[in-house]
């Protein structure tokens, strides 16, 4: 592992050279290597084994989402890919990694000022880890998503390469900036959209961004997520994905109490000035929420908070387990896994949620709390249309470079990546090969369902496809 602390004392040109020197022990072409299939083990066994701490009654929802396509399988199989990546050689350069860096964990969300921001938006698996792991998972997800959208294998591989190239070029730009400028930099999605070559697709994207910028970010979710029943604010039930804790779903009466207790305890982890804001609201209702693909089965609840004048605030409490990267990258320094997620998000995002905090329940389980965002801004589904997926690939690659540069050494990484396309081609080769592995793993999941080994739930149509964001 490279001694990053010692390197920080060196000027940028020396750090670039140190990165270049790493190619001797970790050639860039070696990033094309795939995990050995002999002795790899059954990926379905690994998924089942690592699901023992999840809510077992929700696992059929998880399997139903993962079985939809090889792409959705990859989204839910972060633990499988982490094991595979852990067996491959690395450069030794570590960053605060996303840990689950597939393309649906990027998107547009509203900043506190209401401006649309494109960034990473899921951090359940974040941990200090080799920078290549995030790049490779993103590239593999692009290959599978492109194929799922009807692109040829060669075109899908080109999209993965485009994302890696954007990562390399953006990292080189960041390496030339002073630390303060690099830290506060953000990806200008509007400027990048202007680079879309297809005129119709470019105009469509610019119109969508203009609409997002005009969308209010405050209580806009209220009519969709809640209503007033006899004057009482209440979260809408949308079974089987959002529902209240009742005698049938919570016979012990503990789930609702747990959620309310966690919202109370979480306040103490907020910055003191943020507590003044939270204290203006009172908790009016809580409901259970099934989330994402990879997170299905973890405890997650929505809290509807109301101020004295009826203005709403939606907070979400979500269970945090150890990162899937931990067995291969090392454990988190934080005792509470919720704190691990919060610190990772604050590190990786340019503009983080001001309501981020964490808590633990009496059973020693860990959780983090965040504001429930307006999904119309957060969803990446519209960017995944076939005529814009190449633009989205470039956008994700550049965004990931910015995120990694905040905790990693941009000059060191840029020195390792260099100015040629050697790294880009190697990761594109890896992505194409790993997409085939994921497709084979997906076939094993389908067989396990067909054999009755795994039971799948009957989901609403909107819960099955690639447009469901955030794991």
Question: Locations of the language-model features?
Answer:
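Intrinsically disordered, low-complexity regulatory segments
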Residues: 2-8
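Conserved ATP-binding subdomain of kinase catalytic cores across diverse folds
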Residues: 8-98, 103-214, 262-458, 469-471
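Long, low-complexity segments enriched in small/aliphatic residues
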Residues: 187-261
């Amino acid at each position: 592992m490279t001694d990053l602390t010692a390197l920080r004392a060196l000027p940028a040109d020396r750090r670039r050279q140190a990165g270049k020197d790493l190619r001797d022990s970790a050639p860039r072409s070696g990033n094309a290597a795939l995990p050995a299939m002999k002795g790899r083990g059954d990926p379905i066994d690994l998924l089942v084994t690592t699901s023992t701490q999840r809510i077992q009654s929700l696992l059929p929802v998880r399997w139903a989402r993962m079985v939809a396509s090889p792409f959705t399988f990859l989204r839910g199989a972060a633990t499988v890919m982490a094991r595979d990546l852990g067996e491959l050689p690395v450069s030794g350069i570590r960053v605060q990694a996303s840990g689950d860096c597939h393309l649906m964990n990027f998107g547009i969300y509203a900043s506190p000022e209401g401006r649309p921001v494109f960034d990473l938006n899921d951090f359940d698996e974040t941990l200090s880890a080799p920078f290549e792991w995030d790049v490779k998972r993103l590239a593999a997800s692009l290959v599978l998503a492109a194929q799922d959208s009807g692109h040829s294998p060669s075109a899908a591989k080109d999209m993965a390469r485009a994302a890696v190239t954007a990562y390399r070029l953006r990292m080189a730009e960041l390496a030339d900036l002073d630390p303060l400028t690099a830290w506060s930099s953000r990806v200008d999605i509007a400027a990048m959209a202007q680079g879309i070559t297809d005129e119709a697709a470019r105009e469509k994207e610019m119109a969508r961004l203009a609409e997002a910028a005009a969308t209010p970010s405050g209580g806009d979710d209220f009519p969709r997520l809640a209503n007033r029943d006899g004057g009482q604010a209440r979260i809408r039930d949308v079974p089987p994905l959002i529902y209240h804790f009742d005698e049938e779903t919570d016979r012990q009466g503990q789930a609702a109490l747990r959620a309310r207790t966690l919202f109370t305890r979480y306040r103490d982890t907020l910055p003191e000035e943020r507590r003044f804001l939270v204290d203006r609201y009172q908790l009016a209702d809580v409901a259970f929420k099934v989330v994402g693909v990879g997170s299905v089965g973890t405890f997650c609840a929505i809290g509807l908070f109301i101020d004295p004048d009826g203005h709403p605030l939606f907070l979400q409490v979500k269970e945090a387990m150890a990162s899937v990267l931990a067995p291969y990258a090392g454990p988190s320094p934080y005792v509470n896994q919720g704190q691990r997620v919060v610190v990772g998000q604050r590190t990786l995002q340019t503009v983080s949620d001001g309501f981020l905090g964490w808590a633990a329940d009496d059973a020693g389980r860990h959780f983090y709390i965040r504001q429930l965002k307006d999904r119309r801004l957060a969803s990446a589904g519209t960017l995944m249309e076939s005529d814009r997926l190449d633009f989205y690939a470039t956008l994700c690659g550049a965004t990931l470079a910015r995120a990694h540069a905040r905790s990693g050494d941009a000059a060191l990484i840029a020195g390792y990546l260099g100015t040629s396309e050697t790294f880009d081609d190697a990761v594109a080769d890896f992505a194409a090969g790993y997409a085939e592995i994921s497709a084979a793993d997906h076939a094993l999941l389908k067989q396990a369902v067909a054999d009755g080994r795994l039971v799948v739930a009957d989901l609403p149509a909107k819960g099955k496809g690639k447009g469901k964001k955030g794991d």
